[in-house]
C-alpha cells in the first residue's frame, strides 16, 4: 500500500548516502560534546533537506509529508540529533507559518530555513506541558505592537535557532482574546526583551540545546502575529494541527534510531560466539529478532499511513497512534538490542547505550504516550475530554453525582 515511488526511492538513497557518509561518523562526537553540529547542518542545507515542504515559489521543493518522513528516518538512523534537526526544519513551526501565515511571514520564515536555520516552536511552560492551553505567557496589545511577558520551557534549539514561533495569551485593553502565535527572529542584534535562559541538559539527542526562554516586555509588531478570520480561539486549534505533522516526524526519528540499533544488534549476533557457536543460533535470540522486525515494520507502515492522511496536516488520531507505537517500539527495540551485547552494551564505548538514551525522549516530547492515548480515546468514544485543570475537577465532580 505504501510502496515508494521511483522519485521517493531516489530521495531515500540521497538522504541515506549523506547520512551514512557524513553524519554517522560524527554521531558519537555530537553526543559527547553536546554541541550543535553546525557543519552537519550546513551540509543538510546544501543537500536541500531543509525546508523541503516549502512551496517552490519561495525556494522550497514542494515535497510531501511522506517524502519528508522518509528522509527523517534515514537521518535519524545515522544520528538522532540530525534526525531531530530535519524534523524541526521541515515540520511544526515552519509548517504552521507556511499554511496560516501572511506572504511576508512565509517569506521571512522560508529565507531563514533555506539558509540553514532550525526554527524553535515555543509552547511549553514550567506549569503548562501536556495542558498547553494553561500557558500563562501573555501578549498585551499596545498600539501597533504586542508586548510579551512570561517564560517558556524545554525550547528545542534555544540559543541556536533564529526563527521563533511563540504562543501566548493575547489581551486587548485587558480583555483576553485567546491564544495567539507570534513570529520573532533572534540574532546578534536582539530583539530586546528576549532572553535565552539556562540550558536543560538532556539524557539523549544531546546535540540540540534545550533551554528556558524568558520574555521581558518583548515587543513584536502586529504584522508578525498569525491572524485568523474566525478569531484566535479557532486559530489556536488550527495552529496546533501543525503539531500532527511534527508528531509523525518525531515518530520517524524514533524509528530511525531503533532501526540502527536493530541492524547493529543483528550484526553482533552473527559474529559473536558463545558456547562454541554464534549467538544467532540460539532460538531465544532468534525470536527476539523476529519480534523486533515485526514491530519496526509495523511502526514504519503506521507512520507512512499517518503521513498521507488528512488534507493539510496528518489526521490527528493517525498521527497520535503512529507516534505512540513508533516511540514505544523504539524504546523496546533499543533495549532488546542492548541486551544482545550483554555487559558490553551497557558500556559507554558501545553505541547501544546512546541509542537507548536517544530513543527515550520520544514517549515524552511532542505529546506523552499517555496524553496521546487520552486524545485517541476521546476521538474513538466521541467525547470531548477536559484539557484544563478546572475541566478535570468539574468532570470528577459530575461523575460522583
Swiss-Prot record:
- EC numbers listed for it are 3.13.1.4
Cite a single GO MF annotation: acyl-CoA dehydrogenase activity
Where is FAD bound in this sequence? 121-124, 130, 153-156, 272, 339, 343, 366-370, 387
Q: Which residues form the signal peptide?
A: none
Describe how the cofactor binds: Binds 1 FAD per subunit.
Principal EC category: hydrolase
Q: Where is this site: Important for activity?
A: 84
Looking at the record's lineage, which domain of life comes first?
Bacteria
| Phenotypic consequence of gene deletion | Deletion of the gene completely impairs growth on DTDP or 3-sulfinopropanoyl (3SP) as the sole carbon source.
**Protein keywords:** FAD, Flavoprotein, Hydrolase
Entry-linked SUPFAM superfamilies: Acyl-CoA dehydrogenase C-terminal domain-like (SSF47203), Acyl-CoA dehydrogenase NM domain-like (SSF56645)
Q: Which residues bind substrate?
A: 243-244
> Per the entry, which co-factors are needed?
FAD
The reaction(s) catalysed by this protein are: 3-sulfinopropanoyl-CoA + H2O = propanoyl-CoA + sulfite + H(+)
Looking up NCBIfam families in the UniProt record yields:
SulpropCoADesulf
Q: What else is known?
A: Does not catalyze the dehydrogenation of acyl-CoA thioesters. The absence of dehydrogenase activity is most probably caused by the absence of a catalytic glutamate residue in either of the two positions conserved throughout the acyl-CoA dehydrogenase family.
Q: Assembly and interactions? A: Homotetramer.
Q: To which protein family does this belong?
A: Belongs to the acyl-CoA dehydrogenase family.
The free-text function statement in the UniProt record for this protein reads: Catalyzes the conversion 3-sulfinopropanoyl-CoA (3SP-CoA) to propanoyl-CoA by abstraction of sulfite. Does not show dehydrogenase activity. Involved in the degradation of 3,3'-dithiodipropionate (DTDP), a sulfur-containing precursor substrate for biosynthesis of polythioesters (PTEs).
Protein name, entry field: 3-sulfinopropanoyl-CoA desulfinase
Gene responsible for this protein: acd
